[in-house]
UniProtKB/Swiss-Prot annotation:
Family: To M.jannaschii MJ0417.
Domain of life: Archaea
GO molecular function, one term: 5'-3' RNA exonuclease activity
Organism annotation: Methanocaldococcus jannaschii (strain ATCC 43067 / DSM 2661 / JAL-1 / JCM 10045 / NBRC 100440)
Disulfide bonds, paired cysteine numbers: none
Annotated Gene3D superfamilies: Metal-dependent hydrolases (3.20.20.140)
Name recorded for this polypeptide: Uncharacterized protein MJ1587
Pfam families per UniProt: PHP
SMART domains: POLIIIAc (SM00481)
Length: 171
């Protein structure tokens, strides 16, 4: 089964790279599902920053495209970002990682640490070893040089092999 479980839509908000501000994504939900279907991807998770709105909107198109949609969010905590999958409502940003994970699990969701060693994105780093996470992203397409992904892969495979989670499919 092909899945891409870390996708942002136009609802994801404004990102910052140093002093530059830019839309995190400009993708329409319809276009995301059209591309997913074309590539043979069967499941997508919409994980906009601090909102489930994009996931909710994309879920409405699920049957039209025959691609399963998981509603999620990439939530900013006091220490870094955590992805919640299978969410029913927004989780407030700015909570501790522990509180965020608790709120994800209260909804029956999964808590995933995205890009744990990113020098650019807000990352949890070695805190991933102390938290009750369901998975850790070991490949993130934003880090195309491979260095950050290799650090995550090597550390997670060594310490948490059952939680290594490649949540991005790349052909």
């Amino acid at each position: 089964m092909k899945a891409d479980l870390h996708i942002h839509t136009k609802y994801s908000g404004i990102g910052k790279f140093w002093k530059l501000k830019f839309p995190d994504s400009v993708e329409e939900p319809r276009n995301i599902l059209k591309v997913a279907k074309k590539k043979g991807i069967e499941v997508v998770a919409i994980t906009d920053h601090n909102t489930i709105r994009g996931g909710v909107e994309t879920k409405k198109l699920e049957k039209e495209f025959g691609v399963e949609v998981v509603i999620g969010s990439e939530i900013m905590t006091t220490e870094g970002e955590i992805i919640g999958l299978f969410l029913n409502e927004d989780i407030p940003k700015g909570l501790s990682p522990e509180e965020t994970i608790e709120k994800i699990k209260e909804q029956g969701g999964l808590a995933i640490a995205p890009h744990p060693y990113s020098p650019i994105c807000k990352a949890l780093g070695d805190r991933i070893f102390d938290l009750d996470l369901d998975g850790v992203e070991v490949f993130n397409a934003y880090h195309r040089d491979g260095i950050v992904n290799n650090i995550a892969l090597n550390k997670v495979i060594k310490e948490l092999p059952q939680k290594a989670f490649c949540i991005y499919w790349r052909e």
